[in-house]
Regions:
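Non-catalytic signal-transmission and effector/linker regions of two-component phosphorelay proteins
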Residues: 1-17, 58, 123-126, 130-141
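Charged docking surfaces used in two-component/phosphorelay signaling
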Residues: 27-35
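Acidic catalytic/metal-coordinating carboxylates
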Residues: 44-48, 75-78
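Short amphipathic alpha-helix used as the core "switch/output" element in two-component signaling
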Residues: 51, 77-89, 106
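Active-site beta3 strand of CheY-like receiver
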Residues: 57-66
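Receiver (REC) domain active-site loop signature in two-component systems and cognate sites
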Residues: 71
């Protein structure tokens, strides 16, 4: 897949990077978002996500990041910290099977846009991604 920010000359609603160690979750998110018109890239963990992003020619090739918290290798907290430092204008939405209110509040205070517990509600996911895309659009200038 070729990455690059969407413009009025490129098709689709935007590009989403899904970072989750559970293949079934990545598939569910990919299918839901693809049907809604988004381009989706997947990573199994934070380490792979960092590699994907750093390998791209354009450092702002992704519009929204959906990231699990508990993953092997580089976990979600570490990945989120990396994303926020390197790409502060890219909205991050946390997805996790361990809903912890205190953790969610702390992540929101640290600049994460939203928090979606698993199992993921497809309609809620689309609503949150749409809001994140709108936020991303306002941050692009």
């Amino acid at each position: 897949m070729t990455w690059g920010m969407h413009t009025k000359d490129t098709p689709g609603k935007g590009r989403v990077l899904v970072v989750d160690d559970e293949e079934n979750v990545r598939k569910l998110v990919r299918v839901s978002l693809t049907k809604a018109g988004y381009d989706v890239e997947e990573a199994e963990n934070g380490e792979e996500a960092e590699r994907i992003i750093q390998a791209q020619d354009n450092p702002l090739m992704v519009d929204v990041i959906l990231c699990d918290i508990r993953m092997p290798k580089v976990n979600g907290i570490e990945a989120i910290t990396f994303f926020q430092k390197q790409y502060p204008s890219v909205p991050i939405v946390v997805i996790t099977g361990f809903p912890d209110t205190e953790m969610a509040v702390n992540l929101l205070k640290q600049g994460v846009m939203d928090y979606v517990p698993k199992p993921i509600d497809g309609a809620k996911l689309l609503d949150i991604v749409s809001k994140a895309m709108a936020k991303r659009g306002s941050l692009k200038g």
